[in-house]
From Swiss-Prot:
It comes from the Bacteria. It comes from Campylobacter lari (strain RM2100 / D67 / ATCC BAA-1060). GO terms for cellular component: cytosolic large ribosomal subunit. This is Large ribosomal subunit protein uL16. Belongs to the universal ribosomal protein uL16 family. GO terms for biological process: translation. Part of the 50S ribosomal subunit. Binds 23S rRNA and is also seen to make contacts with the A and possibly P site tRNAs. PANTHER family: 50S/60S RIBOSOMAL PROTEIN L16, LARGE RIBOSOMAL SUBUNIT PROTEIN UL16M. The lineage of its organism: Bacteria, Pseudomonadati, Campylobacterota, Epsilonproteobacteria, Campylobacterales. Gene3D superfamilies: Ribosomal protein L10e/L16. The keyword Ribonucleoprotein applies.
Length: 141
């Protein structure tokens, strides 16, 4: 599972996920991509589940790039614990996703196969996404 090797601080404040993505919105590696159309939070398990779904569909042809990395710790207190006594332990690692962010890129397969593979990955993610090509990337959301 994806997580940072080490961090400066163990725990982080929740924060708010507002606005649109201003980085990670354009193609870097591949010809086809999965782009977020709404805000959400993705954890390392969801990233891995979607990656497995799309690589199995294309039978490991071509190449896939994961353009997101969960670097934000999410904490949780144990069940049936009274309030207070500090912040809970780190439960999982997440990344805030804003609309317009590219999550996966693919190359080395034809468009129809990439569309089907990325649609399978799309169903594993907790927010709405859409399939984009290098030609159609200028359409915003």
């Amino acid at each position: 599972m994806l997580m940072p090797k080490r961090t400066k601080y163990r725990k982080m404040m929740k924060g708010r996920n507002r606005g649109y993505a201003n980085r990670g919105t354009e193609f870097t590696f591949g010809d086809f991509a999965l782009k977020a159309t709404e805000a959400g939070r993705i954890n390392s398990r969801q990233i891995e589940a979607a990656r497995i779904a799309l690589t199995r569909f294309v039978k490991r042809q071509g190449k896939t790039w994961i353009r997101v990395f969960p670097d934000k710790p999410l904490t949780k207190k144990p069940l049936e614990t009274r309030m207070g006594k500090g912040k809970g332990a780190v439960e999982e690692w997440v990344m805030n996703i804003k609309p317009g962010r590219i999550i996966y890129e693919m190359a080395g397969v034809n468009e129809e196969m990439a569309r089907q593979a990325l649609t399978l990955a799309m169903h594993k993610l907790p927010f709405k996404t859409k399939f984009v090509t290098r030609e159609s990337q200028n359409e915003i959301y």
